[in-house]
Amino acid sequence: MVEIRLTNTRTRRKEVFRPIDPQNVRLYLCGPTVYDRAHLGNARPVVVIDVLVRLLRHLLGADHVTYVRNFTDVDDKINATALARKEAGTPGTLEELIRERTHETIGWYHADMDALGAERPDHEPRATDYIGEMIAMIETLIAGGHAYARDGHVLFRVRSYADYGKLSGRSVDDMIAGARVEVAPFKEDPMDFVLWKPSDDELPGWDSPWGRGRPGWHIECSAMSYELLGESFDIHAGGIDLQFPHHENEIAQSCCAHPHGDFARVWLHNEMLQVEGRKMSKSLGNFFTVRDLLDQGIPGEVIRFVLLSTHYRKPMDWTAEKAREAEAVLRRWRGLVAGVEPAPGPAPAVVAALADDLNTAGAIAALHEMAGQGDGPGLLAGARMLGLLTEDLGGWIAEGPDLSALTERMAALRADAKASKDFSAVDALKQRLLDAGVEVRMSAAGVELLPGPDFDAAKLPE
């Protein structure tokens, strides 16, 4: 059995992954708050964890993995979006507009993630379906002295949990000293966070022992993961921006409500995304959603390839040049595997790279080597471990040009040139290929020809 090693944010070490129950590996990914389209940064953890799930199912069996990704469908941002629509004259009550918006946004999210080749999780719980479980968990926290009710709010008593701050490497006193926020009068301590808050008549709300209200964000994930995965499960994942306060708060409330469990054993966090070397933001004019890219004609498979080309723990820079290069590579690879059956399993080099802390860049390097060797079956099997070259994602491309004869011709000329030290024939063929829009890659692994965005079959040498 191949050993998987993952970098655990909680311990700050790369560790051998040892499932609690090898017959049922359980993992949870924080999903979207459904008020608007998913931007590219939202897609990165989805694609990364999709590869992890594929790896786990390959090694342990398809039926031995339970993957949960939630929808946060009760949130102030959702309320604000619906209120803006109501004020703009959209007919319907605020409650109806909120329901319409969340339903619409979940549909958008599914369509966009499907376009990136991300397989649907086993469970996609919606927060509003677990309100009763959240209330029960809050009652448990109050009974244990970890939470208190005041002015219609319920707050978690942060200092009641001695390990608070260990995930993010912060101390409570340092956090208070560095805070620049006005402390709400109903808080005992500035660091205490909301588990439940009151709702007025127009906003979504549910009856509770503390009056009509709605849950805080953090309790939602704790309640849903407990109900679907238990008090101890294997992996919790999300973007590094969620490490604090969201994940820190999840740990605190879950471990206090269920003191005999570990909550999540392994914490995986992907780094942030940049665009052309700068932070993605609306103020810089470089903010875009997954749908924006798809509507620009960038195929979902190309977006996926670019997302996987950088290790998940490194900041990822999206550039137009990377997208063009990815498209050229995928065109070449699809040409190589046209009409080919995949090998019985992915090459050991691909599996080994993914087992080493999800080194997707290393796995792609192994695929490049197979492509250079003309190993279509191996390339296809390995690429599918990454969710690439699948039938579902192939609709964007016509059947790729068959460059195998030219590849063999270049390889033969190159071999002769190495013996004779005369590379004139190699250079001449290379130039004609470049003129036809073909990228020529030559390495110790062999020759690889990739149709580029300016590819013109009419200019290919005969």
Curated annotation (Swiss-Prot):
NCBIfam families membership: cysS (TIGR00435)
Magnesium is among the record's keywords: no
GO molecular function: ATP binding; cysteine-tRNA ligase activity; zinc ion binding
Annotated binding of Zn(2+), by residue: 30, 221, 246, 250
Motif segment ('KMSKS' region): 279-283
Residues bound to ATP: 282
Signal sequence coordinates: none
CC terms in the record's Gene Ontology section: cytosol
InterPro entries listed in its UniProt record: Cys-tRNA-ligase, Cys-tRNA-synt_Ia_DALR, Cys-tRNA/MSH_ligase, Rossmann-like_a/b/a_fold, tRNA-synt_1_cat_dom, tRNAsynth_Ia_anticodon-bd
Localization of this protein: Cytoplasm
PANTHER family: CYSTEINE--TRNA LIGASE, CYTOPLASMIC (PTHR10890:SF3), CYSTEINYL-TRNA SYNTHETASE (PTHR10890)
Family: Belongs to the class-I aminoacyl-tRNA synthetase family.
Keyword ATP-binding annotated: yes
Needed co-factor(s): Zn(2+)
Catalytic activity of the protein: tRNA(Cys) + L-cysteine + ATP = L-cysteinyl-tRNA(Cys) + AMP + diphosphate
Enzyme class name: ligase
Organism, scientific name: Paracoccus denitrificans (strain Pd 1222)
EC number: 6.1.1.16
Entry protein name: Cysteine--tRNA ligase
Entries under HAMAP family matching the protein: Cys_tRNA_synth
Alphabetic keyword roster: Aminoacyl-tRNA synthetase, ATP-binding, Cytoplasm, Ligase, Metal-binding, Nucleotide-binding, Protein biosynthesis, Zinc
Record SMART domains: DALR_2
